[in-house]
Each structure stands twice: as C-alpha cells, then as structure tokens.
Amino acid sequence: MKTEIFPVTIFKSKVNGNEILKQNLVQPILDSLDELEIPEDWTTNKIYTSFEQEKDFIENNKDILLNNYHHTIDEFFDDQYGLHFTDFWYNVYLDGEYQEIHDHLYSKLNHSHFSFIHFLSYDKDEHRPPEFSDPLRAMRYLSLEMDSNRCGEVYIPSVEEGDLLMFPSYLQHCVLPGKKTSKPRITISFNAIVTLYGDERRIY
C-alpha cells in the first residue's frame, strides 16, 4: 500500500460576469499605466502594478469585484466561512514582463491565509500562466521519494480568461517573461484572512 500525505491544494473556477468586468475595467486600467511605479522591493523592472498605489480605483470597484468573486469562492470552501480581505491590486503585462518568485506573506502578525488571482484579460496562446514552486523542494533532496521525485519542482496550472485561482499565501510562485503582444495580460490579485471556518471563528 502506498499513501500520499500532506497535500498542497490550489483551487480554480470561473468568475461570473467576467466579460462585463472586462468591458468596464480594462480600459481604465490601461489608462492608468503611466502613473504606476514598480515597488522598490520588487526585482522585476518590466511590469505595471497598482500594488501600493492607485487605491482609489480599487476601492471604487472592490464591491463590484467581490460581488462577482463571492459565488466563485463559495465553490472552494467545504463549510461555512468568512474572509477579511487585506489587499487588492492589479498587474498588467505587455512586453516581455515578468514577476520574480515571491509569496504573499507581507505581515509578520496578520498574514493572509489565502491569496487569489483573477485573470481578467488573458489569452492562453499569448500569455504565460503563473508557476508554483514546491514548498518542500529543499527537504525532498534529503530523502528518496521514488514516484514523488518525478513530480518536478513546479506546478503550472492551465488557466483561461475569467478564471479565479485560490492558493495558500505561503506558496511561492512567479510569472516567466512573456512575448511581446498587443493583448494585455491583466490580473487582479487579492489576499484574505480566514475569520470563520465551520464552528471556529477568529476575531479580527
């Protein structure tokens, strides 16, 4: 008998009304690119991001986005749940942009449990999906796991426009450089602290 233990799970489903969101949000996002700056602690020099800026745009559209996201997120949880959303931002990739490997553990005290990526504008023939890294990569080198050694060190999900990914915030991931294209790759990302799961409640 062989038993695989301690899985790492990511979730994926479609966002309702993505086409309407795309029609309403893509152009305002593209119009803001000249105002965006790359955060100082990011390695990439070829990405447009609203991280740490453009908060008014996000705040003005957060309720609309969450109304569409909640139905999708409901599919991910197997019991009653509550979430406190801590960050919202968008990234735009146009000309070979990339995102270095990173996680979403920004706070030492109130770190998020789950992170999300919504592929608002995405062409799977033109754009690169995120790549997730095995969190036990270094430890696996200390042992022989036979079948597990053929699993590779990264997982690349198959994503389409309108998909929403949910994954543990500690899970490191990156986006490899894409090719030059006239089609913008636009994602909306956000983090969440779980405040209720089943009968357990966290006061936040």
What are these regions (language model features)?
Residues 114-118, 182-198:
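A short hydrophobic beta-strand segment most commonly corresponding to one strand
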Residues 155-158, 177-181:
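Exposed beta-sheet edge/beta-hairpin loop segments within beta-rich domains
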Residues 1-81, 98, 129:
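Non-heme Fe(II)/2-oxoglutarate
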Residues 84-92:
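A short glycine-rich, His/Asp/Glu-containing loop-to-beta-strand
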Residues 100-104, 173-180:
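Short beta-strand His + acidic residue motifs that chelate non-heme Fe in jelly-roll/DSBH
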Residues 94-166, 198-203:
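Catalytic core of non-heme Fe(II) oxygenases with the double-stranded beta-helix
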